[in-house]
């Protein structure tokens, strides 16, 4: 990941070599699991004896449920009951099912030795969802493979976000693209600075130093506010907002 990072054009460059680069150099293992209710379920089923199955697609899940019905560990296939057809990627078909909790937790699979298997109750870190965006948005690898495999829509020409995303979106995009494609997820980054109060502190309702942007726009007009934002700092630097000028 560090090697691939050297090919990305960062603006400012110091964020790529400094904040982001140092983060990669001192990277710890990414713990993907989260003990939550809302989110993407981990597709891992385990038996009480430690056997595991990691499900890679809904087609595989459908087939595993069919095997579990035959083994007597499930009375019926809930996907089949709802009229879901594997391989039909239409919205109409996918709206028939919901594989979030609690529904997915009711699916019991069967191990190679015939033991019932229950799903690992934890969820995936929501940042995994965010970092999967280049692939998930086009349903890769199940559809539109050329978009990724032939680099028609990947990697992105550039992305732009706040500097606080070096450990969030910038990192998860980079990590997942490296794992899946040994590639960068984006060719360039515009790392925006943050809007702070006039003393350089983070705006907070608790501190009472937050500025209502709609009130400022209503008072001065949108173009003067834009001009103020553009001329008082570079896009990648933090801006100390002071209504006095």
Question: At which residue positions do the language-model features occur?
Answer:
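Structured secondary-structure scaffolds
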Residues: 1-245
């Amino acid at each position: 990941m560090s090697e691939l990072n050297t090919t990305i054009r960062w603006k400012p460059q110091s964020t790529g070599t400094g904040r982001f680069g140092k983060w990669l150099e001192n990277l710890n293992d990414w713990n993907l699991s989260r003990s939550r209710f809302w989110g993407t379920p981990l597709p891992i089923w385990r038996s009480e004896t430690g056997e595991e199955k990691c499900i890679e697609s809904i087609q595989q899940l459908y087939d595993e449920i069919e095997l579990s019905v035959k083994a007597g560990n499930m009375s019926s296939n809930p996907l089949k009951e709802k009229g879901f057809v594997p391989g039909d990627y239409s919205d109409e078909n996918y709206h028939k099912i919901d594989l979030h909790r609690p529904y997915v937790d009711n699916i019991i699979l069967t191990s190679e030795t015939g033991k019932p298997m229950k799903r690992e109750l934890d969820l995936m870190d929501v940042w995994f969802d965010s970092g999967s965006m280049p692939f998930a948005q086009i349903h890769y690898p199940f559809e539109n493979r050329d978009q990724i495999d032939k680099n028609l829509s990947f990697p992105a020409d550039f992305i732009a976000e706040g500097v606080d995303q070096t450990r969030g979106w910038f990192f998860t995009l980079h990590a997942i693209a490296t794992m899946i494609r040994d590639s960068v997820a984006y060719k360039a980054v515009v790392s925006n600075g943050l809007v702070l109060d006039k003393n350089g502190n983070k705006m907070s309702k608790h501190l009472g130093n937050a500025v209502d942007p709609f009130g400022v726009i209503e008072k001065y007009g949108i173009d003067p506010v834009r001009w103020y934002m553009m001329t008082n700092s570079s896009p990648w630097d933090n801006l100390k907002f002071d209504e006095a000028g």
